[in-house]
Amino acid sequence: MDKIKIITDSTCDLSKEIIEKYDIDVMPMLINFGEESYLDGVEIKVDSMMERIEREDTLPTTAQIVPTRFIEKYKGYLEEGYKVISIHISSNMSGTYQSACLAKTELESDDIVVIDSRNVTVGLGLIILKAARLIESGITLEDLEKEILEYRNHIKSTIAFESLDNLVRGGRLSKGKALFVSALGIKLMLNVLDGEMNVQGKIRGTKKMVKAMIEQFDSIPKKEGEPIILVELENEDIYLPIKEYLENNNIEYLKLPLGCSVAIHSGPKVCALFYVEEY
């Protein structure tokens, strides 16, 4: 049986309890407020970060994990007799995956597998959880890679994106247009498709958004035994009805908070469902 260590990055948004249970090594991204840098989830938490963004009306940036950090991490585990599976945020959203690939190339080791999750937040988290369960079953690194490359293709998501504040702060949207959209009560429904954020629809009103999310969730057959994850940041108007729906229908789910790295780009008032389609 291979002795395998899972390495990921802090965009996976898994809870401390899950990380400790499966002994997952989560490498923090850097959150930069000007010249000040903080390790995501270690030196700064999402609540304090959002408060600072609001107070200072400034948007921090994120920095990818550099190859030297991966080299150091991989070498340490290889020396301890581990094989490594390193699974990261979509390469379309960050250069972290490329950094991990450069580190593997530098070390010239067949005992390191690097995977582009093509996902983010708990979509990446679902893949990490799958890898952890497979490792517990005694899988080899070679077979684990095959399983995860297939599994990642079946992660589905339904995301309510209400606030345009961070798009304005980041210069991606004019304040005037944001005010116009907000005044109309328009909310965006998105998903992660082929490693990128994809706008599925523009929906007017909270009740219609909840209805659309539930309808889409119901329309996709789920793979039995795989987790359903509900993730939320400052959006109880959508989170609570979704939670009530799941509980009334005896649908088991995990509730996890959105982390710093993702919240910088999404802004507040986000709620999403991530799950695995039948395959």
Swiss-Prot record:
One of its GO terms (molecular function) is lipid binding. Gene3D superfamilies: 3.30.1180.10, 3.40.50.10170. It holds the Pfam family DegV. SUPFAM superfamilies: DAK1/DegV-like. Hexadecanoate binds at T62, S94. The keyword Zinc does not apply. InterPro entries: DegV, DegV_C, DegV_domain_contain. Keywords: Lipid-binding. Residues 4-277 form the DegV domain. May bind long-chain fatty acids, such as palmitate, and may play a role in lipid transport or fatty acid metabolism. This is DegV domain-containing protein CPE1310. It comes from Clostridium perfringens (strain 13 / Type A). The lineage of its organism: Bacteria, Bacillati, Bacillota, Clostridia, Eubacteriales.
